[in-house]
Amino acid sequence: WYSSMFAANIKEEPMSHHHHHSHHSHGHHHSNSNSNASSPRQSPLPSPNPPSSSNLHLEQYLKQQQQHQQQQQQPMDTPLPLTPPGLPNPMQIIMPANMRPATQPTPTIATPTTTSSAIVALQSNDKLQALTPPMDVTPPKSAAKSQQSWAEPEKDHDLMSNSSEDMKYMA
């Protein structure tokens, strides 16, 4: 798109590019038509600038439209528009779990609600784990379980390697 915009700008408003490409545009305009080279210089600001700005805006507008169309097509292809932008991992984890039971003819309607609630649950779990006062019930249990399961193999390993030091730590 840049080359086409560049060519359009040179054709419709050669004055702005005279500064950048003074030699090239100067020679080409004189060889092609002297009127084109002389008229923009006489009225540089009023005539060439409006087409340049309109061209730029049209180009940007077209690009934005194309981007929006692509963005609109993506959520239609992926039935979960909520998950891809912010939380790709939960989508990958939740998608198979939800798609297996949701074998109804309308999975796209069933999955967004479940995934949004699951994402909210994931976010709330993360927040609670980060804060840990509301979840005081579960972290101690999990920590105790992990410590116990962690200590049992360590005891065996410690008795094998150097029992005196490690038994002091375990006691």
Swiss-Prot record:
Q: What does this protein do?
A: Gap class segmentation protein that controls development of head structures.
What is the designated name of this protein? Protein hunchback
Q: Where is the composition biased (Basic and acidic residues)?
A: 152-171
Instruction: For this UniProt record, give its keywords in alphabetical order, as a comma-separated list.
Output: Developmental protein, DNA-binding, Gap protein, Metal-binding, Nucleus, Repeat, Zinc, Zinc-finger
Locate the compositionally biased regions of type Low complexity.
32-42, 52-80
Q: Where is this region: Disordered?
A: 14-93, 124-171
Q: Which GO terms describe its molecular function?
A: DNA binding; zinc ion binding
Which family does the record claim for this protein?
Belongs to the hunchback C2H2-type zinc-finger protein family.
List the record's Gene Ontology CC terms alphabetically.
Answer: nucleus
Tell me one GO biological process term. Answer: segmentation
Q: Does the keyword Lyase apply?
A: no
Q: Where in the cell is it found?
A: Nucleus
Question: Could you tell me where the Basic residues compositional bias lies?
Answer: 17-31
Q: Which residues form a coiled coil?
A: none
Gene that produces this protein: hb
